[in-house]
Amino acid sequence: MAGVRAVQKEKTRRALVDAAFNQLSAEKSFSNLSLREVAREAGIAPTSFYRHFSDMDELGLEMVDEAGLMLRQLMRQARKRIDAGGSVISVSVDTFFEFITNSTNVFRLLLRESSGTSQAFRTAAAREIKHFVDELAEYISYKHQYSQYVAYVQAEGIVTIVFTAGANALDMSKAEREQLKARVILQLRMLAKGADFAANKERGK
């Protein structure tokens, strides 16, 4: 019986997270969400919300954690495509833009909360983005035999470029996004050339 209750509790908690993500939009940030509206969409009474989260901030922090996890899963998915013979930069950009298209509100949350008014949210969002940079740097270092420093600088540059492009892409038409993708691919190729130059300089070449 206790096991059934635990499963039901987890399902309701999941429904609350999904409901909150669903309510985000270009006009509505997390700080504008109402506990009552989130609970209603999740199919529970507002008072039942507190059985799952102590307040809306705790719900928001869980959403930020989940967004970060999705980003890292995204990169692993891109790696599989690359290992199957795809171009590193083109595949990475395509995968990231698919994420923006398919998980728009997840990206919006990370984007907004990394520069929002809540210190706790800013810290959590920055931590998730740094995890993403760290994992990407590790992959670059392994793939190209770069030093940790050069790999980290390149990874940080990649994330800065794609996040900025992602923010711009949210309000673009499909044709405009394709043009943006082409520019981002060129920018990342330029960055890769610079990283290669820096790595060779370190090696004394």
Swiss-Prot record:
InterPro entries: DesT_TetR_C, DNA-bd_HTH_TetR-type_CS, Homeodomain-like_sf, HTH_TetR, HTH_transcr_repressor_FabR. Residues 11-71 form the HTH tetR-type domain. Pfam families: TetR_C_46 (PF21943), TetR_N (PF00440). Disulfide bonds: none annotated. The keyword Transcription regulation applies. The keyword DNA-binding applies. Gene3D superfamilies: Homeodomain-like, Tetracycline Repressor, domain 2. One of its GO terms (molecular function) is DNA binding. Keywords: DNA-binding, Transcription, Transcription regulation. NCBIfam families: PRK11202.1. This is Uncharacterized HTH-type transcriptional regulator HI_0570. The lineage of its organism: Bacteria, Pseudomonadati, Pseudomonadota, Gammaproteobacteria, Pasteurellales.
